[in-house]
């Protein structure tokens, strides 16, 4: 079985396991599917030939590829996450394989009229000639991050079967609940024992990322007073309208649909409720730490304004920081970025260095003493029914993992 065949076989099998995390759950991991998947990976890591394969009570899977050199090489790690996003259903994923893709529109689901088009997704024709894997139009695919996870598995298998490629000790980890910001919450950096690591959790070919958002989540509860609408004058307080009023205070242009590059935003992720009570969940993002703090203060000030207007119980705010920009922790060990950059160039891949408009486990791990930049995996349109992945790009990602390991040994 060549690399491409192994990638397809593993990936299509892995995405069929429902591993969506759950923001509302307080268990670790938050869903049983992640435990099921972790147990499967433990067995497969052992089958490949890795050692020190463990899965702890919190669902964190770790394993070791022993060094095959006498050189004193720093221990490096490769990480991916077990869970998939909560934005769209991940149950009963039916991956569709399109070999030698012609670059044109793909009808994902004729019955539901779900069509992946170049008009909506202009990057699509660039994958002409590739083998791509799509959804059937009813679920997300789960390439985020089962593409990265698959690539690590295939790369480790490749290194074991090609002992002429010299490398130091490599540690592998698969983490739960990344999509809800809890990935590193119970990650044992000391037990992992790597000097630094890479998350395989990026997007298109060439992605190399070591700047991430500063991130916070804000949960707002709006409490109203419900009465019969016929006699509601001066009595009713509509909680849903309070939520609408709060949102109206936020700058319209500071939203994901209007921002790019280094621009931050407020994002209304969900709004549920009725006259009596409504709940809104926002995420707050900015690359600049001062701007990040200013955004959080803006939310607090809006809440205060509304409390003064309607009463303290009318709006209740719970806000917490989720992760910070990893750049601060990557810069002192810039060589780990340089080696990844050189590895890509040597494989005729043009590195695309850009800020992550999101977060990875590496965002938090970098602040826990494990500097962790992010590398591409080949996926596009994450978290929805139009998600797809290029197997050709996945193969390139495997080659990058192998080349990074080789270069660390060579330069030791």
From Swiss-Prot:
Gene Ontology MF term list: metallopeptidase activity; tripeptide aminopeptidase activity; zinc ion binding
Entry's EC annotation: 3.4.11.4
Domain of life assignment: Bacteria
EC top class, as a word: hydrolase
Active site: 83, 178
GO cellular component, one term: cytosol
Annotated catalysed reactions: Release of the N-terminal residue from a tripeptide
Role of this protein: Cleaves the N-terminal amino acid of tripeptides.
Name of this protein: Peptidase T
């Amino acid at each position: 079985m060549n690399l491409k065949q192994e990638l397809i076989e593993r990936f299509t099998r892995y995405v069929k396991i429902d591993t969506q995390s759950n923001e509302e759950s307080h268990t670790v991991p938050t869903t049983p599917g992640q435990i099921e998947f972790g147990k499967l990976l433990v067995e497969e890591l052992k089958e490949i030939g890795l050692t020190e394969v463990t899965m702890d009570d919190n669902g964190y899977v770790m394993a070791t590829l022993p060094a095959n050199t006498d050189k004193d090489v720093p221990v490096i790690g490769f990480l991916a996450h077990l869970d998939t996003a909560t934005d769209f259903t991940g149950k009963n994923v039916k991956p569709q394989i399109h070999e030698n893709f012609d670059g044109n529109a793909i009808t994902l689901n004729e019955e539901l009229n779900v069509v992946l088009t170049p008009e909506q997704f202009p990057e699509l024709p660039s994958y002409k000639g590739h083998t791509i894997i799509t959804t059937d139009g009813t679920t997300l695919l789960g390439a985020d991050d089962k593409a990265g996870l698959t690539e690590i598995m295939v790369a480790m298998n490749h290194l074991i079967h090609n002992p002429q490629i010299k490398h130091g000790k490599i540690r592998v980890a698969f983490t739960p609940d990344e999509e809800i910001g809890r990935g590193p919450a119970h990650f044992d950096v000391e037990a992992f024992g790597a000097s630094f690591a890479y998350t395989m959790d990026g997007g298109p070919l060439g992605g190399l990322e070591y700047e991430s958002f500063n991130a916070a989540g804000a949960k707002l509860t709006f409490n109203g007073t419900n009465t019969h609408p016929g006699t509601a004058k001066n009595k009713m307080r509509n909680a849903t309208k309070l939520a609408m009023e709060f949102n109206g205070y936020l700058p319209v242009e500071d939203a994901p649909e209007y921002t790019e590059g280094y621009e931050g935003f407020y994002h209304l992720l969900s709004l549920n409720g009725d006259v009596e009570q409504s709940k809104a969940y926002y995420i707050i993002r900015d690359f600049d730490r001062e701007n990040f703090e200013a955004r959080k203060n803006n939310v607090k000030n809006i809440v205060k304004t509304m409390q003064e207007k309607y009463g303290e119980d009318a709006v209740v705010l719970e806000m917490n920081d989720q992760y910070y920009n990893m750049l601060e922790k990557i810069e002192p060990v810039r060589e780990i970025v340089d080696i990844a950059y050189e590895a890509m160039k040597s494989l005729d891949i043009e590195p695309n260095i850009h800020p992550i408009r999101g977060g990875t486990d590496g965002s938090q791990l970098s602040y826990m003493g494990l500097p962790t930049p992010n590398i591409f995996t080949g996926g596009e349109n994450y978290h929805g029914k139009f998600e797809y992945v290029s197997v050709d790009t996945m193969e390139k990602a495997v080659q990058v993992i192998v080349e990074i390991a080789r270069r660390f040994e060579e330069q030791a």
